[in-house]
Amino acid sequence: VTLGYAGDASYFLVYGTIAEGLAQAGGTLAAQVKVARLLSQGEALPQAAMGWNAVGLNVVPVFNPSMGYVNYVVPAVFVLILHQVLLLGTGILGATQNQRSGRGEQGYWQQVPVLALLLARTLVVGGLFVLPVTYFFGFCFDYYGIARTAEPAALWLFTLPFLLATTWLGVVLGALFTRRDLPTQVVLISSLPLVFLAGFIWPLELIPTPLNWLAQWVPSTPAIEGFL
């Protein structure tokens, strides 16, 4: 007996659930048929049960105890949210100052050295995200029951370069535009491609090499790989 099934894999969550359910149902039906055949041949029930599956599989998940998408997808989404919001805020700040300078307005950003302005913006904007990082990686992880194997010190040691790189990328993004609405459009449009290029939803082996190379320049991509 051949059991065939097909589905639209573009809906990967629905497709995965349906495919797993059909595979389990087919395996159970095949086991029942084989056990019934062995019983009809005079085999005892314990021997017949062992006959169709002599080797048992004991799966022990290490990094994803629930074997679900919460432990796998949610942490990556948290990292992407932090990245996009920080990038958006820093980019809007820089673009707003460029827009005001274009109208002939004077501001503090024109009266201080570039390195001093960059240092101040890094400390202020990056420092503001200490609280969101604590909320996402602390309270939210505990609330959703997400497995966490890293020590707090190691987590912060990895978070620091992520915040620095994202802040500086936002500074570069803000310097490229003279209208404050443009960084918002760029960040929003880039969100979905960054999700698929990060490698936790779509396999990296199936992503074109040029796109994968470009994605490595965005802080969220190596950060998601490192956190997961």
Positions of PLM-derived features:
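Hydrophobic alpha-helical transmembrane segments of multi-pass membrane transport proteins
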Residues: 60-140
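Juxtamembrane loop-helix boundary motifs flanking transmembrane segments in multi-pass membrane proteins
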Residues: 49, 58, 62, 66, ...
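Alpha-helical membrane and juxtamembrane elements of multi-pass inner-membrane transport
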Residues: 16, 55, 72, 116, ...
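Short amphipathic alpha-helical interaction/hinge segments
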Residues: 33, 37, 86, 102, ...
